[in-house]
Amino acid sequence: MTNIRKTHPLAKIINNSFIDLPAPSNISAWWNFGSLLGICLILQILTGLFLAMHYTSDTTTAFSSVTHICRDVNYGWIIRYMHANGASMFFICLFLHVGRGLYYGSYMFPETWNIGIILLFAVMATAFMGYVLPWGQMSFWGATVITNLLSAIPYIGTSLVEWIWGGFSVDKATLTRFFAFHFILPFIISALAAVHLLFLHETGSNNPSGIPSDSDKIPFHPYYTIKDILGALLLILALMMLVLFSPDLLGDPDNYTPANPLNTPPHIKPEWYFLFAYAILRSIPNKLGGVLALVLSILVLAIIPLLHTSKQRGMMFRPLSQCLFWLLVADLLTLTWIGGQPVEHPFITIGQLASILYFAILLIFMPAISIIENNLLKW
């Protein structure tokens, strides 16, 4: 009798995705982040569900309902902080996952890569709306500033912003709809992640060498299941260290002050994982230009496959490209730092230089260096 896991319609899908899946024998720990992102998503949905049971999406009670969760609900404080810091872990895994894709040429699977970019936008939108829900000072002013950016769109901008707000300012209608969207988006993300996996399994995983590995495959279980479990344990360890020892390390103290439309905080800034994009936005003195640069800072990833000029897939054997990649990482860290600084000298200039360098590396230097490397190897 054939094993039920290979014949049952539902079990067969799980089997072909997580058990009998042929995987390259040499994929490193950088390939762990896909499964870690899945764990983050499940964790966020579960903690979010329990928070939604006690949260009220009304401007008068939202802040006090979050306080109530932390003070009065059984283990509410740990659920709340796991959800808030879980978002940070989610983005750490996301950035490492995208970085891995850039380094090893995983963008050569165009469908998987493009769905990944859509996923990145969806997760960013979800995180932004989630940050608005506690209705603290930074929630309110963050929502006001970021939604206001849409008014830069010619002709329809102002109407679009008022339509999103549900009024003439960020108010009750805005909070209610943000809660609704924040609740539904993770399920859309789950569906997109399934499609992301579907396309990945059409081609099979890439590997560090960038060489096709069809001749040397091993089953996913037990080799990579055990490896993923180790990664998951380390992720949960890091998350719980953050939650239990310094839960407010990555948050903003301003968000412990209830939202006040009459009092603007001195420095409006988003959560740390948006600071790089925020720095790029602020580096352009024109409103529409800034918004375009903000969108392009992520959308630029979509044209990376078209700019691949190297004869090799990954950067494993390309030291010049490796130097450029790590320069890009340093540049993103610089942008993250600048995004959290006030708009004054010398931060403005540093931000502008770092923004130019970010686009220059991706659009000019990387393709150019790849051509030079091809010539050095006489290919």
From Swiss-Prot:
Binds 2 heme b groups non-covalently. Heme b b562 binds at H83, H182. GO terms for cellular component: mitochondrial inner membrane; respiratory chain complex III. Pfam families: Cytochrom_B_C, Cytochrome_B. The keyword Iron applies. One of its GO terms (biological process) is mitochondrial electron transport, ubiquinol to cytochrome c. It is found in: Mitochondrion inner membrane. InterPro entries: Cyt_b/b6_C (IPR005798), Cyt_b/b6_C_sf (IPR036150), Cyt_b/b6_N (IPR005797), Cytb/b6-like_sf (IPR027387), Cytochrome_b (IPR030689), Cytochrome_b_C_euk/bac (IPR048260), Cytochrome_b_N_euk/bac (IPR048259), Di-haem_cyt_TM (IPR016174). It is a multi-pass membrane protein. One of its GO terms (molecular function) is ubiquinol-cytochrome-c reductase activity. A ubiquinone binds at H201. Belongs to the cytochrome b family. Component of the ubiquinol-cytochrome c reductase complex (complex III or cytochrome b-c1 complex) that is part of the mitochondrial respiratory chain. The b-c1 complex mediates electron transfer from ubiquinol to cytochrome c. Contributes to the generation of a proton gradient across the mitochondrial membrane that is then used for ATP synthesis. Heme 1 (or BL or b562) is low-potential and absorbs at about 562 nm, and heme 2 (or BH or b566) is high-potential and absorbs at about 566 nm. This is Cytochrome b. It comes from Martes foina (Beech marten). The lineage of its organism: Eukaryota, Metazoa, Chordata, Craniata, Vertebrata.
